Amino acid sequence: MALLLLLFLGLLGLWGLLCACAQDPSPAARWPPGPRPLPLVGNLHLLRLSQQDRSLMELSERYGPVFTVHLGRQKTVVLTGFEAVKEALAGPGQELADRPPIAIFQLIQRGGGIFFSSGARWRAARQFTVRALHSLGVGREPVADKILQELKCLSGQLDGYRGRPFPLALLGWAPSNITFALLFGRRFDYRDPVFVSLLGLIDEVMVLLGSPGLQLFNVYPWLGALLQLHRPVLRKIEEVRAILRTLLEARRPHVCPGDPVCSYVDALIQQGQGDDPEGLFAEANAVACTLDMVMAGTETTSATLQWAALLMGRHPDVQGRVQEELDRVLGPGRTPRLEDQQALPYTSAVLHEVQRFITLLPHVPRCTAADTQLGGFLLPKGTPVIPLLTSVLLDETQWQTPGQFNPGHFLDANGHFVKREAFLPFSAGRRVCVGERLARTELFLLFAGLLQRYRLLPPPGVSPASLDTTPARAFTMRPRAQALCAVPRP
């Protein structure tokens, strides 16, 4: 048996070596420098599993802002630092609008949806989603009113704890429900079984997507399939998809061509009732688009709001300055409105610094849609490219104290809010986050509303410095599960 195993491993290594030698079909390609790959494993031995972004930043110190890394057999180009990322994502060519094939997302979405599709299907889904969100009032008063309604419901939950410790994850209920209200036309009671099930499933999916097993599956799909590493997340995704399909079908009888729509799902159904020769808005892709919106719209904003609260508990001096500004501008009785942002420069600076500091999504890969000139190199069509957002948000040439939580990064000498070109938590270019405007609106109104009403403190016996700001292992850099106290302000 041992001899057979050694023979198998030897053949596997030989196969990997032969594949690596035959991998580059484009003799004209001019690849950036990078570490020499090992057979089969490539450069995986140089990357820390829990901190791949930091490992890639360390490699850039040796090989420069544009370098090549081998993820298994996959030759991938990494962009680090603001200048390299900006040139690639916001340049005139926009050649990096595609996504590379990622094994688990190919199985989940089969080329559909918004975030991991490419080409005509992606363009149609994205353009539709942008129009639908605009028509539903994103960034304007109709959605702002929904957010403030949800703020009241969230405050009711926090009041029930009477200043005692509450789970940090509770803060994610409000952003999730705002997303559901836009998608399905109604908010859910926090005890609604559908709401509870969806939040639980989304949490499990996000943890599984960030697991070592799924990362191994994405690099070696054949090995992952052999070990069934992808099965748990596919089962959970199918449970989410079943709920979404039920919600979508419940709306179908109520949607007629030409009628005003009150939700994203209504708009999807109505679009599918019209001329759709490519089937871009047939049921399967409608569910895929809704799935993408559910997963992205709940996890990212929910995690950011939790981080904001956690960092206020860890930095009581910053929290105090935010509350002093809120009291001075709003007073004790008036809830914040969208138009208050300009009058609250320190609050805005703190929110921006939260997003910079946490680097929620360190890197989501792009792919060259054609042979592409990048940083003096020629990359063949289909090359995966990682714009490393962590390296932008921590770029020492752009930020005075990149490793520290410092709201001053977004303030001038007179205390006025300053927009920073290197602030790219939502990425840039044609693949910029489709929900950026909604996320910004939610975060401002919820964060300002919570700090207007509560002091966010560590639990009794826990010092501010003891609050854990180490990210949990998941698809995003979400905070670890812990508790805070929301003490009503006088």
Curated annotation (Swiss-Prot):
Question: Record keywords: Zinc included?
Answer: no
Residues recorded as binding heme, renumbered to this chain, are: 433
Q: In which tissues is it expressed?
A: Very low levels are detected in fetal and adult tissues. Highly expressed in several tumor samples, in particular colon and adrenal tumors.
Residues in coiled coil: none
One of the GO BP terms on file? xenobiotic metabolic process
List, alphabetically, the GO terms of the cellular component aspect.
cell surface; cytoplasm; endoplasmic reticulum lumen; endoplasmic reticulum membrane; intracellular membrane-bounded organelle; plasma membrane
One annotated GO molecular function: iron ion binding
Q: Which cofactor does it need?
A: heme
Signal peptide interval: 1-22
Q: Does the keyword Lipid metabolism apply?
A: yes
- Keywords tagged on the record: Cell membrane, Endoplasmic reticulum, Glycoprotein, Heme, Iron, Lipid metabolism, Membrane, Metal-binding, Microsome, Monooxygenase, Oxidoreductase, Signal
Taxonomic superkingdom? Eukaryota
The UniProt entry, under InterPro entries, shows:
Cyt_P450 (IPR001128), Cyt_P450_CS (IPR017972), Cyt_P450_E_grp-I (IPR002401), Cyt_P450_sf (IPR036396), Cytochrome_P450_fam2 (IPR050182)
Q: What is its EC number?
A: 1.14.14.-
Q: Where in the cell is it found?
A: Endoplasmic reticulum lumen; Cell membrane; Microsome membrane
- Where are the glycosylation sites? 177
Kindly give the Pfam families that the UniProt entry links to this protein: p450
What's this protein's function? A cytochrome P450 monooxygenase that may play a role in retinoid and phospholipid metabolism. Catalyzes the hydroxylation of saturated carbon hydrogen bonds. Hydroxylates all trans-retinoic acid (atRA) to 4-hydroxyretinoate and may regulate atRA clearance. Other retinoids such as all-trans retinol and all-trans retinal are potential endogenous substrates. Catalyzes both epoxidation of double bonds and hydroxylation of carbon hydrogen bonds of the fatty acyl chain of 1-acylphospholipids/2-lysophospholipids.
Member of which family? Belongs to the cytochrome P450 family.
**The name this protein goes by in its record:** Cytochrome P450 2W1
Q: Which organism encodes this protein?
A: Homo sapiens (Human)
Q: Highest lineage ranks of the organism?
A: Eukaryota, Metazoa, Chordata, Craniata, Vertebrata
